[in-house]
């Protein structure tokens, strides 16, 4: 399973660890992914999504129906 948010599309980013001596070693910044079930009243079913905490806030703000419509318009399988 890839580490990509289904709502925002956020992926792992690449950067550096920096020691006290400012030595750089490569590292990955991973998105804060959670698996969450949402009840979709219009479809009378649960939808299971893998999304970031930011994606959950977007669903709280816009509503699950609007977000699912956007995802389906992008071609996401839901």
UniProtKB/Swiss-Prot annotation:
InterPro entries: Ribosomal_bL28, Ribosomal_bL28/bL31-like_sf, Ribosomal_bL28_bact-type, Ribosomal_bL28_sf
Record-level Gene Ontology MF annotations: structural constituent of ribosome
GO biological process: translation
One Gene Ontology cellular component: cytosolic large ribosomal subunit
Swiss-Prot/TrEMBL keywords: Ribonucleoprotein, Ribosomal protein
Domain of life: Bacteria
Region (Disordered): 1-25
One Pfam family cited in the UniProt record for this chain: Ribosomal_L28
HAMAP family, A to Z: Ribosomal_bL28 (MF_00373)
UniProt record similarity statement: Belongs to the bacterial ribosomal protein bL28 family.
PANTHER family noted in UniProt: 39S RIBOSOMAL PROTEIN L28, MITOCHONDRIAL, LARGE RIBOSOMAL SUBUNIT PROTEIN BL28M
Name this polypeptide is given: Large ribosomal subunit protein bL28
Species for this entry: Vibrio vulnificus (strain YJ016)
């Amino acid at each position: 399973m890839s580490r990509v948010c289904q709502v925002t599309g956020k992926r792992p980013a690449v950067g550096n660890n920096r020691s006290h001596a400012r030595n750089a070693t490569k590292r990955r910044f991973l998105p804060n992914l959670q698996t969450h079930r949402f009840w979709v009243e219009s479809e009378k079913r649960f939808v299971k999504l893998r999304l970031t905490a930011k994606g959950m806030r977007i669903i709280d703000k816009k509503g699950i129906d609007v977000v699912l419509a956007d995802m389906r318009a992008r071609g996401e399988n839901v």
